[in-house]
Amino acid sequence: MKRLYLLCMVMLSSLMLSAEEFKELWIVGSAVPGGAQKLEKVSNADFKYAGELLVGELRVTTTKKIGKTTRFLTPVLPDANIVNRGLAWKETTDVTSAAWQVVIAENRYRFHVYTDRKQLYGEIFQPWGELFIGGGATASGWKEGKMQLMKQNIDNPCIWTWEGELKKHENVEEPASFKFQGQDRWYPKAIHPYSADTDILKDNRLRTGGSDTKWTLSRDGIYRITIDLFNEKVNAEIVK
């Protein structure tokens, strides 16, 4: 029994480490401006790139310069496009392993490398036409068709701002919570914090889609909120 317990603990530790073993990740290759770019470490299991890519190929690596200790996160499928809805990758030290393909030069590529599930999701980001805030902390509550419209930046269509009151409303469900939607209803487009009940004043990360986590107020007040949809960042401040 003790041996079985120890075996289970070892297996569990291995699973936990698999999502945390990469301290940093890079992309290198002909498709990468400047030849190499460091990925943003959003969490222990999520590395992200948002920016320009050229026509060519790229490799996801553990080092900026390829050497004997470099590991490659190479696609399982041959000729894998960086734009995809989730493709599996495997880890190798083989410098001749398959690369990710970029077939169109664009300024707004965005992809996530998930180290826990060993998948890469990529897209050419298209600016949204609308963005709303809704929830128990807003005056309109959780009602579809009543959410508050954010203002799109004229010079950068990926930037949205909103200023207004957020406070706890005791007479509604989840009275201090809120989130952002790409339309004046709950589906299909939405953005969420990485963790439930995140304080928007303390964490500037957000993710597109996924589980229905929400922001929760730590203080009532008049808020000014700016969202960068492309870079998946949010900045909030209390103005009064």
Question: What would you call each of these model-derived segments?
Answer:
Residues 1-4:
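Positively charged n-region of N-terminal signal peptides that target proteins for export
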Residues 9-18:
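Hydrophobic h-region of N-terminal signal peptides that target proteins for export
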Residues 21-57, 63-88, 125-172, 183-207:
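Aromatic-rich carbohydrate-binding modules that target alpha-glucans
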Residues 50, 110-112, 132, 163, ...:
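Residues within well-ordered beta-strands of beta-sheet-rich folds
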Residues 238-240:
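Eukaryotic intrinsically disordered, low-complexity regions enriched in proline/serine/threonine/glycine
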